[in-house]
UniProtKB/Swiss-Prot annotation:
Keywords on record: Cell membrane, Coiled coil, Ion channel, Ion transport, Membrane, Methylation, Phosphoprotein, Potassium, Potassium channel, Potassium transport, Transmembrane, Transmembrane helix, Transport, Voltage-gated channel
Catalyzed reactions per annotation: K(+)(in) = K(+)(out)
Composition bias, Low complexity: 928-939
Name listed for the protein in its UniProt record: Voltage-gated inwardly rectifying potassium channel KCNH2
Annotated NCBIfam families: sensory_box
Family annotation (InterPro entries): cNMP-bd_dom, cNMP-bd_dom_sf, Ion_trans_dom, K_chnl_volt-dep_EAG/ELK/ERG, K_chnl_volt-dep_ERG, KCNH_animal-type, PAC, PAS
Residue stretches spanning the membrane: 404-424, 451-471, 496-516, 521-541, 548-568, 639-659
Predominant location: membrane
Domain PAS: 41-70
Modified residues (Phosphoserine): S239, S283, S284, S320, S351, S871, S874, S1132
Subcellular localization: Cell membrane
Ranges spanned by the short sequence motif Selectivity filter, renumbered to the chain: 624-629
Length: 1154
């Protein structure tokens, strides 16, 4: 498995740090954005919500001035101070009365703290709220707790004065550190004094003065009082303030800026810009004298004042971590009492300058006062307020990242040392202790004088250094966070591998040197093998590689055989001196190689012979291949051999059993290829595909496999979350979206949506992408390679990189058909997007749609207009495309609000009076709204109202008969439908040719259902049904089908009723007709028949019946017949009809209008 690096991506820990520090202190705070209007609140904690009684949803996006907490007892000057602090990005404490949601009042101390980014710009504010006391427990405050300067309007114009101001509230707050007598006066050099010189004589502003806006009421502006509209405008303004509203800050917000920017002291404003004073800062009285002199250099400063002066500008108002770390040794700022004192009035009054000087006491730690103040106010301790930016995890000094290159190299070095320890420690303990030849070479030198002892000493030193490094190495906790705190690292290491590493690093040979216990030293040194556990854990990350796993298994097998060989020799060496029969394996080995042991136990084989023979025996036993030349003879040797066989069986099953799986994994790709190729060939054989197509299939499969290695890229992509899929698709299509002109200027969201719809296609040479006659359902963009377009055997175009081919997309027309074959000449990479997906994205981003259609230039139009009868040409599609697209967009934006219930039949909407200039739509009575079966004039369609298309369809009764010579008028379709009659709208001719079904004879019934044309005829489509038609993409298909079914059922009912009515009419006509005898007959006309045969209903004359009644019956359907070349057929009864009575014909009982 790979190394767990943890969450190492840069994170913005600003909010997490604030919440973590404040949760344990019961703080109540809000965070506001300084870069939006009114400094809107972007976060508030639960403590603030409990304090004010509002929920987080009610507080979010409110102005951070908290005007929603104001009430009758809220001080206006305090609210103005908060607004000025926000506007000037100043740190300030303000005591103000707020009201909860339930109306209760409380006195609150508000800390305003600006937050800066890495560039030093204020981007946020933190407002901390601390409840002083409930308002009902105290009366109205009699003290000015916000330390505002009183109005100075009482000063005479042109006279400069100095004055002393007692600040009881300030003295009370700072009495713990610097108590001041109420009437005491300080001096210029007193540490707790601030000297203020006021000169209100009009003078031109100097170059160092701060420009102040003109004001209308000096009293209000000096006191910070103004209308609520002015205060809101002050907060909403984007310009920084000219000066602060108060004479000086609160006791803990007393920092003075040397350059005069961001001052926290308040200045009184004059009535005009010319008389406004400027602010400059000094640390002592001699600085003021230098400023007065102008060109004179300042006298030498005290070391405590001037030492840190070059660093002030960089640290003022700083809240970053780096600034505090550099100056962490500076002590905290003491609480300072600021007093206005009368000091040397005559020289200052005689001074011609109009500057107002503010003298601060000499404090050597003033350089980082703002940061310290933030730390003190927010109680952040060592982890100060972070900058609002993406910050990498904080790494303490001398801390090593666990994934750093140095740690990786060090781990490999320790790995090699551990392998050395695993090999030579058992060998030294078994073969090199108490060897007679070693003792004879150096009788007076111990085991430590051996060459391997120096290497062992170096290994021990490296292990000790590794323990120290582990105490400073980061780790990943359960939350996938990188822990770099030294204390937490030490605790984690103590709970983990410290004990094992410590035992493995103890130099036992040095501790027990000279004691004569060499055997004990050798056994204790085997404790170094405990480090192999950590090595096994580190090597686990390579388990995903088959070759590495195979190599590690073989090394493990050899290492175990080495250890068992050392144990096998130790057993024989231990039994050899005490054995009388000389049957051990060492004696047999000596006899076999001609180096037997003598009677004193000396002689015998060499160490090399012993080790090789022991290793040979353990390997043959582990692999269950024993030749018998080295055999166990004693009981100890036999018991050990049994153990070796058991271990060997386990090793054989675990190691060599995995070899086949490892080899199979190495050839898994080849096996998958052959399996898939076998499926392709079986598919070819089963379907008997001819040889040319078979060859193309096999070539494409081989090329696709070599290109993708048999990996389904789409399946891999779908395994990631959608947001990551969009980023991946944006990267895959980056060259197309960046260099293709139609996609320039699109928003990031639009590009991500388009990238998700694009599909990448790879085509080898000779592959046919589009055949002649195929539907053009996609638009293709070539990113690499070249293609050719053929018509028959003729090459009509060759396209290359950055070319586009397809058809101009028409929102209404059906997809066109290709007029040629598209074949790849080289290896090509193409990006294609389906027309439906493209139209969907453009519909979601209408602002980008106009730019796309105007910039899209198709290199070659594949649409074949000859294959689609009646379809417009390419020039018509390109020329009228924008008009059609806008028409569709306006058509889609309509809201269909038909409250239509299932099973109801839509009714015809009411007709307008005066549908056309001829007045055909003007009819009287309730029947005047019926629709005509004849074609309506184009003029009538032009007067269509905007709301006509959405009017409900309702059934109306017959109207009174029209004059015989007038054709019945009708209502046209909606204006949008008529205007779209020149396009290939599939619904444009849905009701054409329906009016002929009301003809009485069979020739008309044959034309009842006509095939809808692909494109309507040039003549304007007649309007018979006032049904609101919408785009197929917006109106459900089932809605249209249900309306057509209802219409068909209505037609059938009307046809049945019409046939019955006509039969009744004919019977009545036969009864009422006068029998006229022939001229040659003498028969006279008979009189009236009996009463039983007299007609119940008188009838109207035949002409009236023909022109009016039949047309009224036909008006049940709001349909018109298709435009025809010949004149319109007029409905008439067959045969020659005589005169009838003048009585009107009554309607049948089954008539809907009865």
């Amino acid at each position: 498995m790979p190394v767990r690096r943890g969450h190492v991506a840069p994170q913005n820990t600003f909010l997490d740090t604030i919440i973590r520090k404040f949760e344990g202190q019961s703080r109540k705070f809000i965070i506001a954005n300084a870069r939006v209007e009114n400094c809107a609140v972007i976060y508030c904690n639960d403590g603030f919500c409990e304090l004010c009684g509002y929920s987080r949803a009610e507080v979010m996006q409110r102005p951070c001035t908290c005007d929603f907490l104001h009430g009758p007892r809220t001080q206006r000057r305090a609210a103005a101070q908060i607004a000025q602090a926000l506007l000037g990005a100043e740190e300030r404490k303000v005591e103000i009365a707020f009201y909860r949601k339930d109306g209760s009042c409380f006195l609150c101390l508000v800390d305003v703290v600006p937050v800066k980014n890495e560039d030093g710009a204020v981007i946020m504010f933190i407002l901390n709220f601390e409840v002083v006391m409930e308002k009902d427990m105290v009366g109205s405050p009699a003290r000015d707790t916000n330390h505002r300067a009183p109005p100075t309007s009482w000063l005479a114009p042109g006279r400069a004065k100095t004055f002393r101001l007692k600040l009881p509230a300030l003295l009370a707050l700072t009495a713990r550190e610097t108590p001041v007598r109420p009437g005491g006066a300080g001096s210029a050099g007193a540490p707790g004094a601030v000297v203020v010189d006021v000169d209100l004589t009009p003078a031109a502003p100097s170059s160092e003065s701060l420009a102040l806006d003109e004001v209308t009421a000096m009293d209000n502006h000096v006191a910070g009082i103004g209308p609520a509209e002015e205060r809101r405008a002050l907060v909403g303004s984007g310009s920084p303030p000219a000066c602060a509203p108060g004479p000086h800050p609160s006791p803990r917000a007393h920092s003075l800026n040397p350059d005069g920017s961001g001052s926290s002291c308040s200045l009184a404003r004059t009535r005009s810009r010319e008389s406004c004073a400027s602010v400059r800062r000094a640390s002592s009285a001699d600085d003021i004298e230098a400023m007065r002199a102008g060109a004179l250099p300042p006298p030498p400063r005290h070391a405590s004042t001037g030492a840190m002066h070059p660093l002030r500008s960089g640290l003022l108002n700083s809240t970053s971590d780096s600034d505090l770390v550099r100056y962490r040794t500076i002590s905290k700022i003491p609480q300072i009492t600021l007093n206005f004192v009368d000091l040397k009035g005559d020289p200052f009054l005689a001074s011609p300058t109009s500057d107002r000087e503010i003298i601060a006491p000499k404090i050597k730690e003033r350089t980082h006062n703002v940061t310290e103040k933030v730390t003190q106010v927010l109680s952040l301790g060592a982890d100060v307020l972070p900058e609002y930016k993406l910050q990498a995890p904080r790494i303490h000094r001398w801390t090593i990242l666990h994934y750093s290159p140095f740690k990786a190299v060090w781990d490999w070095l320790i790995l090699l040392l551990v392998i050395y320890t695993a090999v030579f420690t058992p060998y030294s303990a078994a073969f090199l202790l108490k060897e007679t030849e070693e003792g004879s070479q150096a009788p007076d030198c111990g085991y430590a004088c051996q060459p391997l002892a120096v290497v062992d000493l170096i290994v021990d030193i490296m292990f000790i250094v590794d323990i120290l490094i582990n105490f400073r190495t980061t780790y990943v906790n359960a939350n996938e966070e990188v822990v770099s705190h030294p204390g937490r690292i030490a605790v984690h290491y103590f709970k983990g591998w410290f004990l094992i590493d410590m035992v493995a690093a103890i130099p036992f040979d040095l501790l027990i040197f000279g004691s004569g216990s060499e055997e004990l030293i050798g056994l204790l040194k085997t404790a170094r093998l405990l480090r192999l556990v950590r090595v096994a854990r580190k090597l686990d990350r390579y388990s995903e590689y088959g070759a590495a796993v195979l190599f590690l298994l073989m090394c493990t097998f050899a290492l175990i055989a080495h250890w068992l060989a050392c144990i096998w020799y130790a057993i024989g060496n231990m039994e050899q001196p005490n054995m009388d029969s000389h049957i051990g394996w060492l004696h047999n080995l000596g006899d076999q190689i001609g180096k037997p042991y003598n009677s004193s136990g000396l002689g015998g084989p060499s160490i090399k012979d012993k080790y090789v023979t022991a290793l040979y025996f353990t390997f043959s036993s582990l692999t269950s291949v024993g030749f018998g030349n080295v055999s166990p003879n004693t009981n100890s040797e036999k018991i050990f051999s049994i153990c070796v066989m058991l271990i060997g069986s386990l090793m054989y099953a675990s190691i060599f059993g995995n070899v086949s799986a490892i080899i199979q994994r190495l050839y898994s790709g080849t096996a998958r290829y052959h399996t898939q190729m076998l499926r392709v060939r079986e598919f070819i054989r089963f379907h008997q595909i001819p040889n040319p197509l078979r060859q193309r299939l096999e070539e494409y499969f081989q090329h696709a496999w070599s290109y993708t290695n048999g990996i389904d890229m789409n399946a891999v992509l779908k395994g990631f979350p959608e947001c990551l899929q969009a980023d991946i698709c944006l990267h895959l299509n980056r060259s197309l979206l960046q260099h293709c002109k139609p996609f320039r200027g699109a928003t990031k969201g639009c590009l991500r949506a388009l990238a998700m719809k694009f599909k990448t296609t790879h085509a080898p040479p000779g592959d046919t992408l589009v055949h002649a006659g195929d539907l053009l359902t996609a638009l293709y963009f070539i990113s690499r390679g070249s293609i050719e377009i053929l018509r028959g055997d003729v090459v009509v175009a060759i396209l290359g990189k950055n070319d586009i081919f397809g058809e101009p997309l028409n929102l209404y027309a059906r997809p066109g058909k290709s007029n040629g074959d598209v074949r790849a000449l080289t290896y090509c990479d193409l990006h294609k997007i389906h027309r439906d997906d493209l139209l969907e994205v453009l519909d979601m981003y209408p602002e980008f749609s106009d730019h796309f259609w105007s910039s899209l230039e198709i290199t070659f139009n594949l649409r074949d207009t000859n294959m689609i009868p009646g379809s417009p040409g390419s020039t018509e599609l390109e020329g009228g495309f924008n008009r059609q697209r806008k028409r569709k967009l306006s058509f889609r934006r309509r809201t269909d609000k038909d409250p239509e219930q299932p099973g109801e039949v839509s009714a015809l909407g009411p007709s307008r009076a005066g549908a056309g200039p001829s007045g055909r739509g003007q009819q009287g009575g309730p029947w005047g709204e019926s629709l005509s079966s004849g074609p309506s004039s184009p003029e009538s369609s032009e007067d269509e109202g905007p709301g006509r298309s959405s009017s409900p369809l309702r059934l109306v009764p017959f109207s009174s008969p029209r004059p015989p010579g007038e054709l019945p008028g009708g209502d046209p379709l909606t204006e949008d439908v008529e205007k779209s009659s020149d396009t290939c709208n599939p619904l444009s001719g849905a009701f054409s040719g329906v009016s002929n079904i009301f003809s009485f004879w069979g020739d008309s019934r044959g034309r009842q259902y006509q095939e809808l044309p692909r494109c309507p005829a040039p003549a304007p489509a007649p309007s018979l049904l006032n049904i609101p038609l919408s785009s197929p993409g917006r109106r459900p298909r089932g809605d249209v089908e249900s309306r057509l079914d209802a219409l068909q059922r209505q037609l059938n009912r009307l046809e049945t009723r019409l046939s019955a009515d006509m039969a009744t009419v004919l019977q009545l006509l036969q009864r009422q007709m006068t029998l006229v005898p022939p001229a040659y007959s003498a028969v006279t006309t008979p009189g009236p028949g009996p009463a039983s045969t007299s007609p119940l209903l008188p009838v109207s004359p035949i002409p009236t019946l023909t022109l009016d009644s039949l047309s009224q019956v036909s008006q049940f359907m709001a349909c018109e017949e298709l435009p025809q070349d010949g004149p319109a057929r007029r409905l008439s009864l067959p045969g020659q009809l005589g005169a009838l009575t003048s009585q009107p014909l009554h309607r049948h009982g089954s008539d809907p209008g009865s």
